[in-house]
Structures are given as structure tokens and as C-alpha cells.
Amino acid sequence: MEFAVKGAEVVLACRNQTKATNALERIRARHPEAIVRTLGLDLANLNALKQAADEFMASTSHLDVLINNAGVMIPPKSTTADGFELQVGTNHLGHFALTAHLLPHLEKASEPRIVTVSSIAHTMGRLRFENMHGEGRRYDKWGHYGRSTLANLMFGLELDRRLKSAGSRIVSLCGHPGYANTSLQRHSLMWRLFNNVALSASRGAAPILYAATEPGALNHPYWGPGGPLAAWGWPGQARMSRAATNKEDARRLWAWSEEQVGFAFDVPSLLALD
């Protein structure tokens, strides 16, 4: 909503069109002048994702800010349309593919940014390249959630390194909302017990908005609440786990992700596309 209030053209790219329409109507009810529309986007389906990206690019001249904010958290065991574990497939691979498709459109903007949303749960994530989807193992929903958010953070950091190496004007940053009261945690017992003390959704979005817009955000790659346990408070520089900053593993993750989505995410080549 804050983007719309400030006069930005906002595209709500959502899988659930009922929720997207409700959000659009709430924004317009409070700010009739807002320029906002919806776009059907299912990050759990690579073909549908590509179609949505193509539709967006055909209807716009450029993209100033991409916020990779879709998320699935500790659901019952399930897979994406492409057979990936749902959390890794949606939270990481979906954003990986979407960013690749939209990169040429971002390069057309004057000061473009990408913000990939991670979580304080990334600290418990472990990459198991031999079995990232946990096939043949007892389903560990928290383990997969931690893995997906660790992958998000590593992807955002590695993307920025590759963009800088290619001489792009695009900046890739990361953020997390802390402990926010949103429906993302609806499968969590902790949410049902402690949601009354969680940050509001708007406060949880503050670090993401900061990373997307503020000049000062360029001084650090990862932003989140700066208060107790990094779960509450106003935006501050967020701590990254040692695993998140492992550049060799980030390169392995990139190669693995390319293999999973079925195409090369070659930054220089994508930036050269018109």
C-alpha cells in the first residue's frame, strides 16, 4: 500500500485472485487515486510463471522494483506443479525463475532494485544438494522452510555479485519481516499462541520497503527489524548466518537452481536482451 500512496504504479502479482482483488479494493477505498492492478502469478508452476512474466512485460515499459515476497510456510507435505517440494519450489525456485524472466525489464529502469524476502528462520536452514527436496525421507516441514529461506538469502546475495560483475545498474538486496502477524504462519502453533504480540503486517513490511526505496539501504545487503531477537522493531541491519555468506555454496545453489528450472540464468546474456 505504501508504494501506491506515494504514487507508484503497483502490480499485485498473486496466485489467489480473490485475495488480490480484496487487497486492490482496500487500497482503492483508502486511496482512490492509487494506480494499482492485479496479475495472476503462481510461483509453484514454472509454465504459468513464465506466461505471467511475459504478460507483465508486454503491458509495461520497464520495472523499477521487484519484491520477491511470495511465501509458503510449514504446510502439509505437498509438491509444486513441476514436482518440487512445495516450500523450496515456491519460495526459492519460483522467485529464481521469475527474477530471470524479468531481469531485462529491470535493466530498462533508471535505479532498479530487487528485494528478495528471507526470514530469521534462515539460520536453521541447511542446503543438502544431494537431496534438496527431501525425497525418500520423513517430511521435515520446518527443515524445508529453513532451507528455502536460506536459499532466498543466498540467491539475493549471489545475484548482486553477478549484477555488479556484469556492470548492471540493478541492485539486489534482501530483507525479512521479523515476527509479523500474517497468514503465512497459519500452519504454525506458535502463530496461534503468540500472534497477539507479533508485529502488524505493515510494520513487518517496513524493512522490505526500506530495502526497496531508501538510499541508506545500499550500505548493507540484508535488512530486518532492529529490535529484540531481530523479530520486533524498526528496520535495521540484519544478521546473516555463516552459511548464507558462503560464496562457493551460493554458486552451487545457482547451478542447481538452473538445473531444476530447466534454463540458464546467465546474467550478462539476460541484461543484453531488449
Please place each PLM-identified region on the residue numbering.
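Short glycine/proline- and charge-enriched loop/turn segments
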Residues: 130-139, 186-193, 232-240
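C-terminal helical subdomain
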Residues: 148, 195-238, 245-255, 260
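Short, solvent-exposed turn/loop segments enriched in Gly/Ser/Thr/Pro and often Arg
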Residues: 176-177, 223-229, 273-274
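Hydrophobic alpha-helix feature that most strongly marks membrane-spanning transmembrane helices
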Residues: 164, 189, 213-216
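Rossmann-fold NAD(P)H-dependent dehydrogenase/reductase core
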Residues: 1-186, 260-272
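Pocket-edge positions in alpha/beta enzyme catalytic cores
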Residues: 12, 41, 196, 242-245
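Short, highly charged low-complexity linear segments
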Residues: 129-131, 210, 215-218, 242-243, ...
